[in-house]
Amino acid sequence: MDRYAVAGYPVKHSRSPAIHSQFAAQTGEPLVYEKLEVLPGTFVASVQAFQAAGGRGCNVTVPYKLEAFEAAARRTPRAEMAQAINTLRFDADGWTGDNTDGAGLVRDIEVNGGVSLRGRRVLLIGAGGAASGALAPLIEAGPAELVMCNRTVARAQQSVQRHAELARARGVALSAATLDDCGSGFDVIINATSSSLAGMPSPVGAQVLRPGSLVLDMMYGPAAKPFLAWAQSHGATARDGLGMLIEQAAEAFFFWRGVRPATDGVMAGIRAELDAA
């Protein structure tokens, strides 16, 4: 059996093993998926040891996505854009890294949420690793406008500058803004900050919404409730990040195995667990 794992610190509560085990059972792929708790300062050595023990690849979660980016021998174009890696494949001539977060987000919005991003006005809140990883796939989806807003606008500007050429090629009006001055009336609003963990209803004002806006928090379950409750109180349609989590996992599975698993049943099962908790 081929071995895969999620590498991070901590990974105790990760749902990745449950998700990938279901993907393996569904597709008939012969693999096992584990948790790899990596102590600070030991990322490369820990992953190398896992590879030496039969590992074929791993997902990478906080706080090691930048270290994975630096350690990879090759990177996919979307990983280069994100400047972060969440999926490593152990090839004979070195590690190949990908970033599946943004692709998972776009697929969740468009396929599971039923909302096409083409021609829409999109607001992305935050400029950390999660937001930066989402930027290129969001641009590729063809919105008319994409605004990245952040508490410190300089960080958002760095990501915007890195993606400026792609945005021009796709005809997307891409810009950076502060949380207090990010515009109004967006069709899709994505929260890539941890504001909900602090119990904050929203890092931006209600002017960003319009009737029927789709609002998504990258957090899922109880962690997303403050932001989503705020959105619903203003008439928006709200989604948490569970779909994104499962869709990015499916992208990683495909990157490793060349087989794309179905996500509906996995999503329904985990949603039922969350609702029952």
Curated annotation (Swiss-Prot):
Keywords: Amino-acid biosynthesis, Aromatic amino acid biosynthesis, NADP, Oxidoreductase. GO terms for molecular function: NADP binding; shikimate 3-dehydrogenase (NADP+) activity. One of its GO terms (cellular component) is cytosol. The active site is at 65 (proton acceptor). Homodimer. Involved in the biosynthesis of the chorismate, which leads to the biosynthesis of aromatic amino acids. Catalyzes the reversible NADPH linked reduction of 3-dehydroshikimate (DHSA) to yield shikimate (SA). This is Shikimate dehydrogenase (NADP(+)). The lineage of its organism: Bacteria, Pseudomonadati, Pseudomonadota, Betaproteobacteria, Burkholderiales.
